[in-house]
Amino acid sequence: MEIPNPPTSKCITYWKRKVKSEYMRLRQLKRLQANMGAKALYVANFAKVQEKTQILNEEWKKLRVQPVQSMKPVSGHPFLKKCTIESIFPGFASQHMLMRSLNTVALVPIMYSWSPLQQNFMVEDETVLCNIPYMGDEVKEEDETFIEELINNYDGKVHGEEEMIPGSVLISDAVFLELVDALNQYSDEEEEGHNDTSDGKQDDSKEDLPVTRKRKRHAIEGNKKSSKKQFPNDMIFSAIASMFPENGVPDDMKERYRELTEMSDPNALPPQCTPNIDGPNAKSVQREQSLHSFHTLFCRRCFKYDCFLHPFHATPNVYKRKNKEIKIEPEPCGTDCFLLLEGAKEYAMLHNPRSKCSGRRRRRHHIVSASCSNASASAVAETKEGDSDRDTGNDWASSSSEANSRCQTPTKQKASPAPPQLCVVEAPSEPVEWTGAEESLFRVFHGTYFNNFCSIARLLGTKTCKQVFQFAVKESLILKLPTDELMNPSQKKKRKHRLWAAHCRKIQLKKDNSSTQVYNYQPCDHPDRPCDSTCPCIMTQNFCEKFCQCNPDCQNRFPGCRCKTQCNTKQCPCYLAVRECDPDLCLTCGASEHWDCKVVSCKNCSIQRGLKKHLLLAPSDVAGWGTFIKESVQKNEFISEYCGELISQDEADRRGKVYDKYMSSFLFNLNNDFVVDATRKGNKIRFANHSVNPNCYAKVVMVNGDHRIGIFAKRAIQAGEELFFDYRYSQADALKYVGIERETDVL
């Protein structure tokens, strides 16, 4: 007979009281532990200092110190003050000397701490005010409403004050685990009490019953359950959610507790974890599983792991690079080469999408060779039927994604038509053992090198290309390769010159008509339809870049330039569109030449190559610190990139109100979505001061899909000059923030 549960309202009230009391107890315990830890560290450090001081005193006692004879003060300088020098060491007599005053030294300008940075660093918005800035006593007395307005900009959220507001505490993971475990003990005690009362009633009626096997089994199972840790009751999570609503709903808390307990287990593996391919526990897995971390962590836009510039915008791309193809070698690589097998070379070349024979779109299937036996043909048919339930198009998409240097994640493409039935080369089967690591590596290499088994064997290093070929036939990977639509060469360029002229006119119209609205570039992702008014690139008036997943022949895609000069005039489409030449698109101007960065003919790729000038930081003649150039530069030559934190416009508004009070701001508008803030992180160009007659100018340039700020020379600048550029202040702000205008030299 089950014991009736108390009413739900009483249970929730009971658990709320328990949650509050346990949370307050844990807070006091944490504070006590922190205080005890600080005291223990202080005592330990003080003991170390005492020990070191005692050692030094003993060393000083062993030294033979001779007192220096005191010098008599020179008379005749009555205006000089006398001072007495006393020594703490015994044996040294006091000395009386004349005091000589030093000349006044100019103070170093005030500089707030900042971290050096060589590229933009995207950060998240700060929705909680970390600290209330100190503006001085004068500002505090005169403008008392500033602090209130600042706190209101963060919706009243200040770090450290959330504990005083009931229900607004964000519980840390450690405290959350301890709180749930502590509350779980109360539920265990209640259940034990209920079980004791129910067991007592049952034992009275069953005292004389014999111990049966069934009762023994129940007793053993009860002991096992009691030994294991019981999962907390749902009422506990409901009570915590009602007391701390900002931490989520009860289901979220339950899932959070389950994840934290699994993470605390040292033997538990993380989710979607593949064993180390170099370890003894390597497994034979599919290509997608082997490259899961690669596709997740590697940024295809800047070719880095854990990129800080595109952490939230990972977009796929199926655009095929126009690079040199890897072809199968015509001659065998050795005695164990697969090309020595009868028909293997023709078989691999026919199914290799990178060979010339696959360049034309085949309208009919090849006829099976007469030398091929019926058994071989039936074997191929059986292999195809066995693989019919696999998605051929998806397998190819995941394989071709790695060969694509612009692809971020495996993408889906249309399934290719069924490959022709060809005779499988029958080779004497050799008992070759493949480890899990070798099989996984083969599947990874096969997505890049396809049927070039000689290259795959060289990369594996443990198998011959004949063995690799036999394993590929066994895996039926050769039959999965599409040969028609996916890997066909570029289409005929019929209206190339006409389209290019129309494209250049479009750039000029866009340059003339458009307003100052510049939006951040986001790659479009609609491979099945052309770019129209719903395309995000067209909606934001951006060109489709090489990272977009639209058709390579898209009319909105920027194809690069065909210049053969320095690309520093408006004759260059890239320079006209205020963007740097792309090394993957501009193949004739020299932007794609990477052998020597300083001798490259194209002058419109300095930002992406980091060809900045040597700058010096020194006190400025205008205000505070200034940036000086160490080498002379010519007009319109690139000097440096303005780097800093990449923040949103809303975050810039919140930070700007504090910077205006300090009368020092390093905010620079990048586009309508983001702002570069060099206050906390930046480079030396952040110290360049404002002037209405500057020698530099700033320009926002599109560099490989990213807006970046370049500082260029407005005129010829000599070595040692201080750099100035126009902050574009209004007249009121210029009088407010700019105190001294630099003296302009008459040239």
Curated annotation (Swiss-Prot):
Disordered: annotated segments: 188-231, 378-421
Polar residues composition bias: residue spans: 395-414
GO molecular function: chromatin binding; histone H3K27 methyltransferase activity; histone H3K27 trimethyltransferase activity; molecular condensate scaffold activity; nucleosome binding; protein-lysine N-methyltransferase activity; transcription corepressor activity
Listed EC numbers: 2.1.1.356
Chain positions of cross-link Glycyl lysine isopeptide (Lys-Gly) (interchain with G-Cter in SUMO2): K327
Domain CXC: 504-606
Protein name, per record: Histone-lysine N-methyltransferase EZH1
Family, per entry: Belongs to the class V-like SAM-binding methyltransferase superfamily. Histone-lysine methyltransferase family. EZ subfamily.
EC supergroup of this enzyme: transferase
